[in-house]
UniProtKB/Swiss-Prot annotation:
Keywords: Cholesterol metabolism, Glycoprotein, HDL, Lipid metabolism, Lipid transport, Lipoprotein, Oxidation, Palmitate, Phosphoprotein, Repeat, Secreted, Signal, Steroid metabolism, Sterol metabolism, Transport. Sequence repeats lie at residues 67-88, 89-110, 111-121, 122-143, 144-165, 166-187, 188-209, 210-231, 232-242, 243-266. It comes from Oryctolagus cuniculus (Rabbit). This is Apolipoprotein A-I. The modification Methionine sulfoxide is found at M109. GO terms for cellular component: chylomicron; extracellular vesicle; high-density lipoprotein particle; low-density lipoprotein particle; very-low-density lipoprotein particle. Its main location: secreted.
């Protein structure tokens, strides 16, 4: 639990925010991404699980056992869905509290990202401009060759390919040159961002020991509240599973009894 909140803040913020920093689109909330991923994962598990149960019951061994798991699966899925609905507000409250507690740290990280972005932006614009110029120059060189191809396609195909090959290599080499130049220019700013992040974490560890302990205590408190509020919903899930387990035990016992009778009569 040491630095749980710091790990969440740094991981989610520097990961998601940095990606949008390069793409220039509106960042989605890290908490929303986690909730969406959890929902998709649970739905996938339910769908794939139902498929496996159906395949098992369709097999010869499944027909012999006659466990009727598929009938109980829908009931179980309904119970799980009910559990999700009951836990929804609880988990939302947990993430809201955690997001609120790390707001100050996230704001500082965003400031650092914005400062570096402003410094780097001219180099990105320059790279984009040069790349567009290279593509336009390549297009102008290729266009006459395309006309040649249309005039005498079959006879000139080999010759055209030979002419295009060095042009493509030239474009590729130019792109590599521009990328290397951009990488060289951006390296100091990347190092600066890393140093700022390291300094920020170090200052929290050394000068903000109380804040770190406070983050840890609040995170534990939120987890404890989440556990207490989730307990009734988990109990409902357990009660919903009992009929499925009892049906399974009864079916297996019947199969064993029939097998024992057959062995005794032989």
């Amino acid at each position: 639990m040491k630095a749980v909140v710091l790990t969440l803040a740094v991981l989610f913020l520097t990961g998601s925010q940095a990606r949008h920093f390069w793409q220039r689109d509106e960042p989605r909330s890290s908490w929303d991404k986690i909730k969406d991923f959890a929902t998709v994962y649970v739905d996938t598990v339910k769908d794939s699980g139902r498929e496996y149960v159906a395949q098992f019951e369709a097999s010869a061994f499944g027909k012999q056992l006659n466990l009727k798991l598929l009938d109980n699966w829908d009931s179980l899925s309904s119970t799980v869905s009910k559990l999700q609905e009951q836990l929804g507000p609880v988990t939302q409250e947990f993430w809201d509290n955690l997001e609120k507690e790390t707001e100050g740290l996230r704001e500082e990280m965003n400031k650092d990202l914005q400062e570096v972005r402003q410094k780097v932006q001219p180099y990105l614009d320059e790279f984009q401009k040069k790349w567009q110029e290279e593509v336009e120059r390549y297009r102008q060189k290729v266009e006459p060759l395309g006309a040649e191809l249309r005039e005498s396609a079959r006879q000139k195909l080999t010759e055209l390919q030979e002419k295009l090959s060095p042009l493509a290599e030239e474009l590729r080499d130019s792109a590599r040159t521009h990328v290397d130049t951009l990488r060289t220019k951006l390296a100091p700013y990347s190092n600066e961002l890393q140093q700022r992040l390291a300094a920020r974490l170090e200052s929290i560890k050394e000068g903000g020991g109380a804040s770190l302990a406070e983050y840890q205590a609040k995170a534990r408190e939120h987890l404890s509240v989440l556990s207490e509020k989730a307990r009734p919903a988990l109990e409902d899930l357990r009660q919903g599973l009992l009929p499925v387990l009892e049906s399974f035990k009864a079916s297996v016992q019947n199969v064993l009894d029939e097998a024992t009778k057959k062995l005794n009569t032989q």
